Amino acid sequence: MILDTDYITEDGRPVIRVFKKENGEFKIEYDRDFEPYIYALLKDDSAIEDVKKITASRHGTTVRVVRAGKVKKKFLGRPIEVWKLYFTHPQDVPAIRDKIREHPAVVDIYEYDIPFAKRYLIDKGLIPMEGDEELKMLAFDIETLYHEGEEFAEGPILMISYADEEGARVITWKKIDLPYVDVVSTEKEMIKRFLKVVKEKDPDVLITYNGDNFDFAYLKKRSEKLGVKFILGRDGSEPKIQRMGDRFAVEVKGRIHFDLYPVIRHTINLPTYTLEAVYEAIFGQPKEKVYAEEIAQAWETGEGLERVARYSMEDAKVTYELGREFFPMEAQLSRLVGQSFWDVSRSSTGNLVEWYLLRKAYERNELAPNKPSGRELERRRGGYAGGYVKEPERGLWENIAYLDFRCHPADTKVIVKGKGVVNISEVREGDYVLGIDGWQKVQRVWEYDYEGELVNINGLKCTPNHKLPVVRRTERQTAIRDSLAKSFLTKKVKGKLITTPLFEKIGKIEREDVPEEEILKGELAGIILAEGTLLRKDVEYFDSSRGKKRVSHQYRVEITVGAQEEDFQRRIVYIFERLFGVTPSVYRKKNTNAITFKVAKKEVYLRVREIMDGIENLHAPSVLRGFFEGDGSVNKVRKTVVVNQGTNNEWKIEVVSKLLNKLGIPHRRYTYDYTEREKTMTTHILEIAGRDGLILFQTIVGFISTEKNMALEEAIRNREVNRLENNAFYTLADFTAKTEYYKGKVYDLTLEGTPYYFANGILTHNSLYPSIIISHNVSPDTLNREGCGEYDEAPQVGHRFCKDFPGFIPSLLGDLLDERQKVKKHMKATVDPIEKKLLDYRQRAIKILANSFYGYYGYAKARWYCKECAESVTAWGRQYIETTMREIEEKFGFKVLYADSVTGDTEVTIRRNGRIEFVPIEKLFERVDHRVGEKEYCVLGGVEALTLDNRGRLVWKKVPYVMRHKTDKRIYRVWFTNSWYLDVTEDHSLIGYLNTSKVKPGKPLKERLVEVKPEELGGKVKSLITPNRPIARTIKANPIAVKLWELIGLLVGDGNWGGQSNWAKYYVGLSCGLDKAEIERKVLNPLREASVISNYYDKSKKGDVSILSKWLAGFMVKYFKDENGNKAIPSFMFNLPREYIEAFLRGLFSADGTVSLRRGIPEIRLTSVNRELSDAVRKLLWLVGVSNSLFTETKPNRYLEKESGTHSIHVRIKNKHRFADRIGFLIDRKSTKLSENLGGHTNKKRAYKYDFDLVYPRKIEEITYDGYVYDIEVEGTHRFFANGILVHNTDGFFATIPGADAETVKKKAREFLNYINPKLPGLLELEYEGFYRRGFFVTKKKYAVIDEEGKITTRGLEIVRRDWSEVAKETQARVLEAILRHGDVEEAVRIVKEVTEKLSKYEVPPEKLVIHEQITRELKDYKATGPHVAIAKRLAARGIKVRPGTVISYIVLKGSGRIGDRTIPFDEFDPTKHRYDAEYYIENQVLPAVERILKAFGYKKEDLRYQKTRQVGLGAWLKMGKK
């Protein structure tokens, strides 16, 4: 594995160094033969001798071209000949390049600014980070002494902390008595100790957080001052600090310095990027912050040093955890881009694309364009036209799937599995069609109306822009390229088409209506041939009733298969039941992995014998399917299907070979001889190899089991198409092409996997979801290319792009997208969790790179910068959005008023491919499949969300997609306890429950389920919904397994395991205390008797026991501890049966749970200091239907009279009766107490008859947030559980038909949905969400509507923050009522004038004028002094403590001067002494609250306020009528 490269100089010549890790060892390789070079384009080749004579000086050395050679290259796709100029040393190039460029014969020079070591990686085709080496990582952090005003590194380093897989430690030079702290004598000794640690541990990766700009520079400067050689490099060098733009970057030779800070800044959006904020954002866990002044105070006073040391240790530990989280992604990007991890982790997305393009340009012999000069850079920064703007909407639209017609007419023939040859118009989504990889699933069928020219190629008709793969052979290679159909009409297409001669044959086989009986007979014959035995036995016995001997004729059919072959076993049972009406008996021998099916009936035996005698005349595919399922396998190494038979079974191979020949499936036979007990034995082998043979086997025969069929698919995918002639499946064909006119429907398919399928026997390209760049071939080398047969012209801007050949960048982007699909398919198929995770990182890296391409065109510093390309992509995006909006308006008479969505982000409960997960919603968003405006969509497969139906039942509903976008809306945090909250956007709806007598008994539940915005909570809706019904599957539990899970629960609560001692290999420890005898009787003894544990022994007199069980010791270490050694609950437990989860919880609560009465109310809780563990327990409780909550003690725990640094976290049981019924306690004393406490209490909540419980918001606050917000589409209910709370999801737009009645609008809306949805890409669909009888729209994010039931919904107009007075809120609410409920705008204006008049006359009660604002930071940190801050400072001066979080309530008084000087606390307001400032409240409170509403109707501010002269403003004359 290559870690990095650089070069050194020996005897004036460069020597490349390659830093590598091989077989666990670090090494440096040297290359002394690589020469620096540049390219020069000359006007006249004869001038090369003059160029070679040019000289320059570098450090007293004369620099010149040492040799030159003419080479053929391409520049923007056009052939060009340039001179390759070689030099002695890389530094010669910058010394001489300008002189060469200025020579009159030189047109330009190229690739003169590619760093030498990077050039080496490109030219040699070397890929950093490639390989499976396990890299050692070490993170470190420093704490320093700093006082305000000091110079950088003036203060000493106080602590150096480091962390790796063995844990975290702190080195310091003051006495601190903590187990993880190493104390030395001085700062100098501390630095030397750290350097020794790095040398001894010898990490491959050093992880820091902002180490580029702080830690390394500080350490180096202090080392210089203290006389310490700061050597960290594996070559004995000190870290190299270099400038990179406006930042620094630090290299450590031979080690990767991974600075997390630039990576995280590029990866996630956060309001602040402190280590604490990042850790909480990534892992959801808070981390304490100790500020510089606190560190200084602790160091100088000696008080609180333990806290600083803990903080320092946690800094290193957190940095290490973050490093482990982000390293794999950056490693994959490094591999993908082909540059070092160090470079890639510090690169912008534009630079990532650039380095990728440079490598691909070299591979394709393309000459890279130059970077812009300073003047050119300024010109480029002039910008280009933005995205489509529909007033009031604004947005930049990129990579929108354009509905390009690349299709076939309706009568084009394809082969569908189980149907045979059918018209393409008859194909349905979910069908399997014959493709290049055999059977391939149809994801989407595309249908369009078309009128125009079709190209007929060998009988296959397609639209001119459709693509067909063409094989072109040269002496060196066989290349497959996609060519446009229209290109076949010219002489530009060289090569042959790929066809299959078996098109009709496979179609006929699939179309054959073979009776099921014949199929089952064939499969049974194949199974018996492979795995069966027909037994006939005569047994002599004495018949006592007749007094003579008799003979019993016994007949038996036996089939033996593997115990794990469940699909095979089910098929065998089905065959016997259908053919013979009997169910086989099943036997399993002890200590074997085999199951034998037996049928002992003469009539069955005779019929099976008859079937076997005619095996060669049975349905051949069925016979082979049965045989290969029994005796065949897929060799994953050789990628073949193979059968082995012993010495005496050659005849079986003969039978199978004849049947394969009958079907035309190529195969080979060979033998393998070996010696066993001095006797020569022979294995007969039959193997189906080659892609053609495998595909024929798959399409005609296949396996019975899903597992083997998937293995076969994988083998086919991994088989190269390396022989396209003279094989059984593919043939190459010459072509003829002509055109014809066509009017009608055209179709295309989107397939899973490789994008090709057979149509009319010819391989054709399938439709993808192309980006604009790919579909329109947008590239600098295709821009306005002369001499092309066909162009795509960008709308509005008029730039034309040649479609005759794939552009450089579109082809690379297409390759990336194809590669990502392959990786994702492989990821889906693999069962290895490590491989799956690596593949996930790979596909995400590809996504990051691919999504960067559009921005690259507009990146002013880019080599392949193309303003015209960027403008064109944007223009096509504008056209797509305009077309969509225009179609709803023109074809259906709608007027689009506003289109937007509401979203939320948090953890959701899903079921993915049948497995339950609790996953952050952003993790569901793996890629951008589609963009519509500023929204991005990721299409999901196999994902369901837990939701609630209208009958109050928990159900799983399909999630077609997840959506995200940026937002400037306010984000509210709704707190349910001090540790349980939900973050939602201001207009996101939660599902509230009306637990009120206003809803009549017996009414449907849906009348109680209401949508409520965050700011509406606490009004009529006071309770929200949380799950309260089991969703885990149930089984008939094994009693011993129940006991085992009870023991594991006890261990997680009160056990200990793991470590390096010999004891830890064989034992786990359990503290039983006074309950030891009961635990022995109920758990340990039954497990010992069942041999689950070997034994247990007393460890102490306090009830501690050691449990002997090597497997259990290993199991607990592997699954129930995290990487930091803390107790953990593995995610696989979320998919255990309900009975085992309950057993685990029973053991856990018996160990760490308590039961008590608090204020007469029963209380059950589990207490821990481990937040991750507590969160997992909550999820397990939800799975078994026990509602719960979580809260954290605010006071830290104490141990030996000292604060321990931990806080108790309590999981509280809400549904106590279900807990008692299903979980309870193992310990009698706790069970008795629980029973006593619950004796007089019942579950009184009305909601308990449904599948949910109620939870009550305690506090709502606005938070700062700058990231993406997310939403998921849930089919049917539009609800899902987020952080255990039921919320609503929506994603829609508003439209109306002016003048139409309600029913017409509703009808036309549904017609539009039926029209537009087939045109939308993927699973993206519009739905009819509701009808609003009136509404108005101010801007794209400000509107108000009222529905048919009179409910008003607003967005962007609400004034719910504390800094709005009641008079402003009340006035706005009345204005909205007047406009929406009564449709009277003039009434709304009268209301505003009335309020402003009352304010002017001091008739408004002072309590309606109070403004509330919160102090959010320390007072000394405020630079601007607002009114609330001014009051706070005055209060503080009077000795009143004002802390962050304090709410200041004030009134603004009449007077002159600054507002802050005229505010007083409300409780000091005296109406007899004070007068409020009426003008302030009119101008700054009331009018701003209503002005943004009424300006939509033509009113201005001066039209709205009370005026004694009653003058009417011009705006009033221009106002719109009633709406």
From Swiss-Prot:
One Pfam family linked to the record: Intein_splicing
GO BP annotations listed: DNA-templated DNA replication; intein-mediated protein splicing; intron homing
Domain DOD-type homing endonuclease: 524-665, 1047-1186
EC number: 2.7.7.7, 3.1.11.-
Domain of life: Archaea
GO molecular function, one term: DNA binding
Temperature impact on function: Optimum temperature is 70 degrees Celsius.
Record note on cofactor: For PI-TfuII intein endonuclease.
Keywords on record: Autocatalytic cleavage, DNA replication, DNA-binding, DNA-directed DNA polymerase, Endonuclease, Hydrolase, Intron homing, Magnesium, Manganese, Nuclease, Nucleotidyltransferase, Protein splicing, Repeat, Transferase
Full protein name: DNA polymerase
Organism listed in the record: Thermococcus fumicolans
Gene that this sequence comes from: pol
